[in-house]
Amino acid sequence: MATEIITEKKEIVARTRSSGITFNPPVTHDMVRSLFDPTIKKSFLECCITLTILANFVLCYYLINWFGLSQAKLIFLIQYVYWRLAYNLGIGIILHYQSHYESLTKYANQNKLFKKESAKTNWIASFFQFEIKSKMPNDYNLHSYPDELNCWLLFRQFVDLILMQDFTTYIIYVYLSLPTDVSSLINWKSLIGIAMILFNIWVKIDAHRVVKDYAWYWGDFFFLQDAELTFDGVFNISPHPMYSIGYLGYYGLSLICGDYRVLLVSVGGHFLQFLFLKYVESPHIERTYGSDSPSNSTQHQIDDLIAKENYDYSRPLINTGILFENFQFLRFSDYFTVSTILVLFSWFFTSKPSNNFLFVLTLLTKLTTWLLTSWILFQQSNRKWFTRLFLKNGYTQIYSYQQWQFLYNYSLIVTNTLLFLHTLSELYSIQSSDGLNNSHVIFGLLLCAIQIWCNVETRDAISDFGWFYGDFFLTNYITTRKLTSQGIYRYLNNPEAILGVAGIWGSVLMTNFSKTNVTLAVLWTVTNLIFVKLIEEPHVSKVYGNGTRVSGVQQTLLALKPFRWISDLIDDWGNKMMKSLHGFDSDSDSESISSGKKGNLSSLKLSKKSKLKNRVQSDNKLAPNSKFEIEDLEDEIVYLPNSVTISWKLPISMFNEKDWIGLYNVLETGSDRTQTKIPSLGHWSAVDATGYPHDSINTNSITEFKKGSKNVSGRVTFDANLLYFKPGIYEFRYHSKNSHKVLLISSPFQISFPEFDNEAQVDIKNEIMKFLDAISCMKNEKYFANDNKYFTADAFSNYIKDSFGIELSTDYIRRVNGDVEVISRRVHDIKEVLDSLN
C-alpha cells in the first residue's frame, strides 16, 4: 500500500493536493467487508465484482469437465498473468499519471463528472454519481466533497475488481496444482506452508489496522490526510510489509503444492509487485513525504570526509554477490582479489576436486579467516593494535584502515567463493544420482537473493564506513555518537547475523540438506552470532554508549514473554563470556606493558626485587669485613642516560688486581649467589687499572682506588658505555680474580628510561637529541650507533616507546636514517592520532 499512516480516533482532516481544499473524509470499509459483509450497503459494481469472483469457481468446474485438469490450469494461469499485469502495470500506469499530473482528478473536473447538473446530460457522470450514492451511506452528499475524494471512491471499485480477480485466479491455479494423493500433503512442508499462510494473514490484517483504507487504496495519490508516517505493528518488522512478508503466503502455498511451476509463478508475481513498488509507489512516497534514503547519514558523511582529507584514499573493492564495485585499475590488491576468484574457478573446473576436499577446504578457510578477522577487531577495539602496528612502521592511520578493508573483503570473497564451489559440486553429484529437487533449488536461490538484498540494504544504511567496521579504526572521524536507525536497521539491530546467512542456508536447501552444507551453514551462523555478541556489541557500547537501540522486530518480539526470557538468557551468557575474555586480555596487557615504564614493571620483577633486597646482608657476608654499596640512588631507580656509581671495600687478603665488577639482570642470574654462570657481555669494569692495562673502556670507569695496609677500596662508575639499555631489575656482582666467583652482590635496582609528557614536536625533538647526545649516539642530528655499541636500533625503539608511549619499529628508524627531526615529528603525529582515537 502507498504509505504507512496511522491516525488517532479524533476527527480526520484531509486536504486536496493541488487546490488545498480541506474536508473530513467519510467512513469507508475494507475490501472484504465491502464485498461480502451483508450488513453493509452494496453498490452496483460491488455486486458485479462479487458475481465475477463466484463465476471463477463455476468456470473452473466446467473447464475441468470439458477440457481436463491441465487445460483448466493453463487457462487460470493465463487469467492470473492477465490480472497480475492489470494490477502492477494497469494500476501502476494510472497511479503514475495521477501522482505526477493528477490525471483522474483533472479529467473528472474538466468533464464535471460529479456536478449535479451533469447527471442529466452525461450518462457517464450519471452512472458514476449513482455508483457512489449506492455505495455510500444515505447522508453522504457527493456534491459537497471535492472531486479528489469522489475519484478515489470510484478508483476503489476498479482496484477491488483487479485485486480480487488476481487473488481468486491464483488460488484456483494453486488448488488445481495440488497433488491428487491427499496423504502426500501430510509432511513438514505442509506445516511450514500453513504457518507461512497464517503469518501472511496476520500481516494483512495488522497492516490494514495500521494504514486503514486511506493508504490501502493509495489515497495519498488523490488527497492528503493530516497524519504522519508511522512504524507500528507489522510495519515495525519489515520494510514495505505488504510487498515483502505480505507475500509469504505465496511461498507457503508453493511449499504445500510441492510443484516448482507454482513456485515459479509465485516468484514471478512477487517480482512484478516489487517492480510496482520501485517504479510507482516509492517515487510517490519520496515526493510526498520526503526521502528516507540514508545517503546523508553520519556514515556516508564520514566516507566523504575520509576521501576529502586523504587525497590518496579510494573507495574499497566490494563484492555485491554477483559483481564488483569500486574496482580501481591502479590498485594491485583489486587484481589480486579478482585473480584469486578466477584461479579458484579454474582449479575447480580443471582439477575437479572431490566434495570432501572442498568441504574441508571451505571449513578450514572459514574458521581461519573468521579467527583472524575477529582477533584483529578484538585487539583493535581494546588496544588499537592494528592501527599501532602500521603507525609504528611509518604508515598512516588511513593506510592501516585500507589494509584492513582489503583483508576483510578478501576473506569474505574467498570463503563465499569456496562455499559456492562446494555447493556447485554437491548439486552436480545430486543431479548425477537422484536428480535435483527443482522446488528446493528455487527456494534456495530465493534465500540467496534475500542475503544479497540484505547486504545491499546494510551497505546502503551504514555505507562503507560501517560495512568495514570503521568505528573500530577511525573513531576520531565520528562526529555524532549515535547508531543509525535508518533503512534495514529500523527493523533489525544486526541484519548480517540473521538475514546475512540466509543464502548459506539456501545452499542447504538446494543440496537437499547435505550434511556438509548443513555443517557449513551452522558454522557460518554460529561464528556470526559469536562475533556480534562478543566483539561487535561490546565495542558498539564502548563507542556509542550503553543506550540500547531497540529494533522494530526486537520491540515486537520482546512483547512476548518467551522471546523476552530467551533474550535475557543470551545476554547473561554473553556477559559472562565477555568478562572471561576481558580478564584474559587484562592479564596479557599487564605483561605486555611491563617493559620499563617508570614504576610500572611487572609484579613478578617487583617481587623478585623485594626478595633480593632482603638477602643483601647475607650476600655481603660472602666476603667478611667488606662493603659494596650503590651511591646516591634515589628510589633505587636509575633513569638513563644517568650513570651509576658503586663503592666497594675488601680486606687486602681477599683482593686481587684482576678482580672485576659485572652488571647483570637479576632474572637471568638464577639462584646461585656464589658463582655467576652467565657472561657479562661487556657490561663490566675493572677495580684496579693495573689488572687490565689494555681494556681502556673497562678501566676508564674507575673513579677511585685506594690500597691500605689492611683494606682495599674504590669507586666505579657505570655510564652509558657500560650500562644496559634494556629496562629491568639489575644488580652488581664483585668477582674474585679473573673468574666468576662472587665475593659481593649489591642491592637490586631498576634501570629505566625517563618518561615525558611533551606534546609539542619541538620538545620531543629536544628530549631525544639531549638523550642521544648524552650517550654519544648522535651525529648531524641523526641517531648514530657507532660510538655506543649497546644502544642499538632496538634500544632506540624501546626508548621512544617507554619515554613517549609511542611505538616505532626499528625498520622505520633505519628507513629514515635515524633523522631526529623526522622521528620526533612522527612521534608527535602518532600521539595525536592515538589521542584522537581515545
Curated annotation (Swiss-Prot):
The chain crosses the membrane at residues 49-69, 74-94, 158-178, 185-205, 237-257, 262-282, 329-349, 357-377, 404-424, 436-456, 518-538. It catalyses: a 1,2-diacyl-sn-glycero-3-phosphoethanolamine + S-adenosyl-L-methionine = a 1,2-diacyl-sn-glycero-3-phospho-N-methylethanolamine + S-adenosyl-L-homocysteine + H(+). It is a multi-pass membrane protein. Pathway: Phospholipid metabolism; phosphatidylcholine biosynthesis. Its EC number is 2.1.1.17. It is found in: Endoplasmic reticulum membrane. Keywords: Endoplasmic reticulum, Lipid biosynthesis, Lipid metabolism, Membrane, Methyltransferase, Phospholipid biosynthesis, Phospholipid metabolism, S-adenosyl-L-methionine, Transferase, Transmembrane, Transmembrane helix. GO terms for biological process: methylation; phosphatidylcholine biosynthetic process. Residues 1-48, 95-157, 206-236, 283-328, 378-403, 457-517 are lumenal. One of its GO terms (molecular function) is phosphatidylethanolamine N-methyltransferase activity. It is an enzyme of class 2 (transferase). One of its GO terms (cellular component) is endoplasmic reticulum membrane. HAMAP family: PEMT (MF_03217). Catalyzes the first step of the methylation pathway of phosphatidylcholine biosynthesis, the SAM-dependent methylation of phosphatidylethanolamine (PE) to phosphatidylmonomethylethanolamine (PMME). This is Phosphatidylethanolamine N-methyltransferase 1. It comes from Vanderwaltozyma polyspora (strain ATCC 22028 / DSM 70294 / BCRC 21397 / CBS 2163 / NBRC 10782 / NRRL Y-8283 / UCD 57-17) (Kluyveromyces polysporus). The lineage of its organism: Eukaryota, Fungi, Dikarya, Ascomycota, Saccharomycotina.
